[in-house]
A protein has these predicted regions:
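Ser/Thr-rich, Pro/Gly/Ala-heavy low-complexity intrinsically disordered linkers and tails
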Residues: 1, 13-42
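Beta-strand-rich domain onsets/edges
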Residues: 29-47, 132-161
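Short, acidic Ser/Thr/Gly-rich low-complexity loop/linker segments typical of extracellular
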Residues: 63, 68-91, 180-203
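Short, low-hydrophobicity acidic/polar segments
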Residues: 76-154
Length: 243
């Protein structure tokens, strides 16, 4: 976990439901933390840095190289480094979708040669970025997909959305309002996915798309709870801070 130099703002946000609220609205227990972050050369825009890594890390850390992160609709973009790190400027707004173009080469993270073909996005919230949270996004290869969904206990459904939540800080229980398949999570101190909804990373498979968003709730106080986007056949990556 990164060390954060906090300023003086720590405000609890009133709980709200998901009826009619827009994506990026705070959810129950959502708080605001402002950190003196390095905005680099982003000027009046917002700098986001983080990592894009292979779904499985149990055999050792492995980033996804040469993926392209781009602000949805055209704009700033950045290619990931060999360790999966990215760094780019995003619009100064409450939330931004970053569309990820997968690398053309096969993964260097798996024994079975395969590429990343799953449409994937990162949903970046300004309040999470400015809290100092570390964004960690994941994706899986075509070969890994069958293994992942065998563990889930149901096949991958392209008509439904996939949602990965990275919990930066204290591992917490995470839930969503939309119907979904059995959750998987990585417990603190491990890099092994297993059944559950509490950990440093939580996966909601085969989520009903519904209106195109769902309310994300984190046990206890957090930054980043609230509505998150859902897209059929697409993996959405979200990060929340749990101080």
């Amino acid at each position: 976990m990164q060390t954060r130099s906090l300023l003086v703002l720590l405000v609890t946000v009133a709980a709200c439901g998901d009826d009619g609220s827009s994506a990026g609205d705070g959810g129950p227990g959502d708080i605001m933390i402002v950190v003196d972050i390095d905005n680099g050369s982003c000027g009046d825009t917002v700098r986001i840095t983080g990592e894009y890594i292979n779904w499985e890390q149990a055999s050792g850390f492995c980033g996804i190289n040469e993926a392209v992160f781009e602000v949805e609709g055209g704009g700033q973009m950045d290619s990931t480094a060999p360790n999966g790190r990215f760094d780019l400027c995003t619009p100064d707004q409450a939330a931004t979708r970053l569309v990820i173009t997968q690398p053309t080469a096969n993964s260097q993270c798996t024994q079975v040669p395969a590429g990343y073909t799953l449409p994937t996005i990162l949903y970046a919230r300004k309040d999470v970025i400015q809290s100092g949270a570390f964004y960690s996004a994941r994706s899986w290869t075509t070969a890994q997909q069958d293994v992942i969904f065998t563990a889930v206990g149901q096949p991958f459904d392209a008509a439904k959305a996939q949602l990965h939540v990275h919990v930066d800080g204290t591992p917490r229980a995470v839930s969503i309002a939309a119907a979904h398949g059995p959750t998987q999570a990585i417990a603190s101190g491990t890099e092994v996915w297993s059944a559950g909804a509490t950990g440093t990373d939580v996966f909601f498979p085969n989520v009903d798309v519904g209106s195109g968003q769902t309310m994300l709730t984190v046990a206890g106080s957090s930054v980043g709870a609230g509505n998150v986007p859902l897209i059929a056949g697409t993996l959405t990556n979200v990060t929340v801070l749990a101080p």
